[in-house]
């Protein structure tokens, strides 16, 4: 492991050296007293008073955290997210001042992740750069060689509840194609809005051979991520929490918890570029109207039994399966009335029906709605057309990657 002084020098090279370069100008929504506190923290940092800077940052973070958690997320002013990001940045770097130990660097990395998750981009995505340096430093100090006592990936107490696997041979299955041309895919599936499984499109991605629980822990274990807790997001007891990937794997995959945990719909690949290098954007996305930067790539990682209730999304979707299998049902948007969407604005894109155990007295028309189904296996990519209703259940420990595009 490189020494703390080397780490400090690397971080110093990334950071602005004057208050002007920090660009602390913020909008009118941020109170003057908060801006003064932020400027004070910057002056303390640049003046070498790291302990005092750390204390000031904690006050800033506590106050801006309250602002971030007041009202709906989409109404949170971006400048408050910038305040939070600046606080996280200064805190992270202060924690790494020599002689910073591994625990301090881990705390600094958590501060960066909190800034990435809750803050807004500042100084050319500097939090991403600092996080990458800190992660590399931590990994260089603990990269254990697999020993004879280690079990194969995912076997140590991985949940094994023998979940039922639907017999899709009795259902109308999603058609399959092997590497169709762009023109054929566009004419027969994209334009008419027909689901299809694409085979041979993702087999060459590095993730197909590299990814295992051990690899994910090695590359991402120390990173803080949002985790959904509960059977499905429509349940009353459903909640979200933040924890490291290592904690998530230990609590919800290695052990047998009473609740299901799911790292769902998270832009993990923006947060951890090392994982992004293991996947590719499907060529078919070029048929869309947007730029490549506008494609939203999400991770879906969890134990067997995770469920995404029947819902629809406002964009085209390629769902690539990397680890494990998923049972998926698809309904055309024309069947919406028979799927009984929730009345509330928040859940209007989600059906009230429990797909595999429907209450047909309450939702009689659901039984008549035609659907397609499939079991999606590693290396396969499912095209889910825009607004197509889809229900997803993991049959195994599973990692999927979704690409939303317009």
UniProtKB/Swiss-Prot annotation:
Cofactor(s), names only, from the UniProt record: Fe(2+)
Coiled-coil spans in chain: none
Protein name: Bifunctional peptidase and arginyl-hydroxylase JMJD5
EC number: 1.14.11.73, 3.4.-.-
Entries under Gene3D superfamilies matching the protein: Cupin
UniProt: a protein binding residues: 228, 265, 308
Keywords: Aminopeptidase, Biological rhythms, Cell cycle, Chromatin regulator, Chromosome, Dioxygenase, Hydrolase, Iron, Metal-binding, Nucleus, Oxidoreductase, Protease, Transcription, Transcription regulation
Chain ranges of the JmjC domain: 261-406
Localization of this protein: Nucleus; Chromosome
């Amino acid at each position: 492991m490189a020494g703390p002084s080397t780490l400090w020098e690397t971080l110093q090279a990334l950071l602005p050296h004057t208050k002007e370069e920090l660009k602390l100008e913020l909008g009118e929504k941020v109170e003057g007293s908060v801006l003064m506190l932020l400027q004070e923290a910057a002056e303390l940092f640049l003046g070498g008073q790291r302990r005092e800077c750390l204390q000031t940052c904690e006050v800033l973070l506590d106050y801006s955290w309250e602002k971030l958690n007041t009202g709906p997320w989409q109404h949170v002013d971006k400048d408050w997210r910038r305040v939070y990001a600046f606080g996280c940045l200064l805190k992270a770097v202060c924690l790494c001042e020599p002689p910073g130990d591994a625990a301090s660097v881990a705390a600094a990395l958590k501060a960066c992740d909190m800034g990435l998750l809750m803050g807004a981009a500042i100084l050319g995505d500097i939090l991403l750069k600092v996080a990458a340096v800190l992660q590399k430093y931590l990994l260089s100090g603990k990269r254990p060689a697999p020993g004879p006592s280690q079990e194969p990936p995912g076997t140590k107490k991985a949940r094994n509840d023998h979940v039922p696997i639907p017999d899709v041979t009795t259902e109308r299955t999603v058609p399959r194609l092997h590497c169709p041309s762009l023109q054929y895919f566009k004419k027969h599936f994209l334009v008419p809005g027909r689901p299809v499984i694409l085979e041979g499109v993702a087999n060459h991605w590095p993730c197909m051979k590299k990814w295992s629980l051990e690899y994910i822990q090695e590359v991402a274990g120390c990173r803080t991520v949002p985790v959904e807790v509960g059977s499905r997001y429509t349940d009353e007891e459903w909640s979200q929490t933040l924890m490291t990937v290592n904690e998530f794997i230990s609590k919800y995959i290695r052990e047998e918890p009473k609740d299901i945990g799911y790292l769902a719909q998270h832009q993990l690949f923006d947060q951890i570029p090392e994982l992004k290098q293991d996947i590719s954007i499907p060529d078919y996305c070029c048929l869309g109207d947007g730029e490549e930067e506008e494609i939203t790539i999400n991770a879906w990682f969890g134990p067997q039994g995770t469920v995404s209730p029947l819902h629809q999304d406002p964009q085209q979707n390629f769902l690539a399966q990397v680890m494990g299998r998923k049972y998926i049902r698809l309904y055309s948007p024309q069947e919406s009335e028979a799927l009984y969407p929730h009345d509330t604005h928040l859940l209007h894109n989600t059906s009230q029906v429990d797909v595999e155990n429907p209450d047909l007295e309450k939702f009689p028309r659901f039984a008549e709605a035609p659907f397609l189904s499939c079991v999606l296996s590693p290396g396969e990519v499912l095209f889910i057309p825009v607004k197509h209703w889809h229900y997803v259940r993991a049959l195994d420990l599973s990692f999927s990657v979704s690409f939303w595009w317009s």
